[in-house]
Every structure is written in structure tokens, then in C-alpha cells.
Regions:
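Short, solvent-exposed coil/turn linker segments
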Residues: 64, 156, 173, 197, ...
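Extended serine/threonine-enriched, polar tracts that run as long, contiguous segments within proteins
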Residues: 166-168, 175-183
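Short conserved micro-motifs at the rims of enzyme active sites and ligand-binding pockets
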Residues: 145-147, 181-185
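Accessory alpha/beta interaction modules
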Residues: 1-168, 244
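Conserved, well-folded catalytic cores of nucleic-acid-processing
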Residues: 48-51, 137, 175, 192-195, ...
Length: 285
């Protein structure tokens, strides 16, 4: 019933610039990799780099321009955005809404895939150049780190010496961000992903005047909005399915614990209290 109500509500919802989900996969690919949007993705990349005092770039060329037909056919590249800077550094960007510790391996795999693709067979290793991976996450990946933006490089442990600048992995954990994390350009972009009002963002960073125009173009396109809605539905039902599986897993574990306690002749009332199962459920085990 809830699923039906969600579908009906979302079908009739009027999409505006401010209620548009800025983390939607279709929208992000359009905003950051559609031809003509190079200045927008460049501003975001530079915001990430400035935040940790790395060099910035003057321009980028998008290597995987957004193509709606390919997107709908599932033939778009595995990373959301891939571009190259004026000094031949590759930047890959991915927005991930759900995940766990295995995302670290996934991001390493995507980085390695991009790095290895820089060389054709028999080409000299001197042709290799840095690959920067930027991962924007709508979940917490590193519970032991308070910072919402962390960056990993290849280092020698004893002397803390960086081996090479060819491997750089940025992780931006949106749930960790709060208004006290005011870090100029990057702060504005995080607010954007989290749904900040566009008029406020324009006051902080004039690139959002251009972003606002692209958002409106996206909304005005029926094919794009249809693809956007479809992605929203997919994410909703996937999340709902994962929640059900998680709840069923927890309940199965409770039954197993209760069964073991019952075999140890533990009082049924204590088993019920310990597991949250009713006494009737315990008796049936």
C-alpha cells in the first residue's frame, strides 16, 4: 500500500529546481557530463582539490559525454563522470547513495580500471598520468573519522613518504557535513547535494547561476524527467527491499538465539526479554 501511494504521489509531483533530487544518478550525469557543462564540473573538482590544498585546474574535457539513449539502454560508463585536465590528469567522479565497507574495493577497482586504460598494449609506462577518484557518498564509510572529506594516497608507512601522485582517492561523506564545515567552494557543493535553496547557493558561488539554468533545462525536458523519475523509483524500491531483507535477517538471528537459549533450558520469559520475541513465539521453537 505504501509503495502504491509513493508511486501515485511521485507521478503527480511537480518537479522544481529546489525539490529536484540533486543526487539522482540521471541528473548528476547530465549536470556534470553533458556537453557545455565543463565549467560546472571544473568548479566542483577545484572545490574538492582546494579543500585539502591540492593544485587546481584551468579546464577539463569530458571523456564520457552524457547520452540519454545510452543511459536508458544501460550502456553508459560505469563511473558517473570521467574527464581529463589540461595537464593530462584523469578525474573520475561517482555519486553513491547506498553502500558499506565494500565500496572501498569498488572505488579502488574503478580507479585501477581507469589507470590501466591509459596505456595501450606495448606502450611505455612513461605515458601513464595521475588518476583522481572523487566519491560522493550519501552514507558513512569511515566511522572512525569525523571529517566529511578524506583523501588517500600511496605512502611509505615508516617515513610517511608519498610514493606517487598517480593514485588519489577522495571520499566525501554527506551525512557528516554540517553548517560548521564551512569550506568555501566545497561547502557550497555539499549544500547543493543536500538540497540547499538555489538562491542561497548563488550568493555563495556564482557558478550556481549556470547550475540553475542547467537544472531548469533538465526539468523542462520530458525525456530527462521521465528518466529521472524512473531512477527515483528504482532507488526507492531497492532501498525498501534492502530494509526488508535486513529486518528479516535480524529476525532470523533472534529466532536462532532464542532456540539455542531454549535448548539450554533458559526461562522463556528471559528468552523473550533478551530477544524481543513473544513468549508464544519462543514456545513454538
Amino acid at each position: 500500500m505504501e509503495e502504491f501511494e509513493y508511486l501515485e504521489k511521485s507521478k503527480n509531483e511537480i518537479i522544481t529546481i529546489d525539490n529536484l533530487n540533486k543526487k539522482n544518478d540521471c541528473f548528476i550525469r547530465y549536470l556534470f557530463s553533458d556537453e557545455g557543462n565543463e565549467n560546472i564540473v571544473l568548479d566542483f573538482i577545484n572545490g574538492v582539490m582546494i579543500d585539502l590544498n591540492f593544485q587546481t585546474f584551468n579546464n577539463v574535457v569530458i571523456l564520457n559525454p552524457f547520452n540519454l539513449t545510452k543511459y536508458l539502454d544501460g550502456k553508459e560508463s560505469i563511473v558517473d563522470v570521467k574527464c581529463i585536465t589540461e595537464d593530462n590528469q584523469t578525474v573520475i567522479i561517482e555519486i553513491q547513495l547506498q553502500g558499506n565497507q565494500y565500496f572501498i574495493r569498488r572505488s579502488l577497482y574503478y580507479w585501477a580500471n581507469s589507470y590501466s586504460s591509459l596505456l595501450n598494449k606495448s606502450e611505455n609506462y612513461t605515458k601513464l598520468s595521475p588518476v583522481i577518484s572523487i566519491n560522493v557518498l550519501d552514507f558513512v564509510l569511515f566511522n572512525d573519522i569525523k571529517d566529511f572529506h578524506s583523501c588517500y594516497l600511496l605512502k611509505e608507512i615508516k617515513h610517511n613518504k608519498i610514493l606517487t601522485d598517480h593514485c588519489m582517492l577522495h571520499y566525501i561523506e554527506l551525512p557528516k557535513f554540517n553548517l560548521n564545515n564551512n569550506k568555501e567552494k566545497l561547502s557550497s557543493w555539499i549544500k547543493f547535494f543536500k538540497g540547499e535553496n538555489m538562491s542561497n547557493l548563488i550568493k555563495e558561488n556564482n557558478i550556481f547561476e549556470e547550475v540553475e539554468k542547467r537544472c531548469q533545462s533538465f526539468i523542462d525536458s520530458d525525456p530527462l524527467i521521465n528518466a529521472y523519475r524512473k531512477k527515483e523509483w528504482n532507488e526507492y524500491f531497492y532501498k525498501d527491499m534492502m530494509n526488508v531483507e535486513r529486518e528479516e535477517g535480524i529476525k532470523s538471528e533472534k529466532y536462532l538465539i532464542a532456540k539455542n537459549l531454549k535448548q539450554m533450558n533458559i526461562d522463556k520469559a528471559l528468552i523473550s526479554k533478551a530477544t524481543g520475541l513473544s513468549i508464544e513465539e519462543v514456545e513454538k521453537l
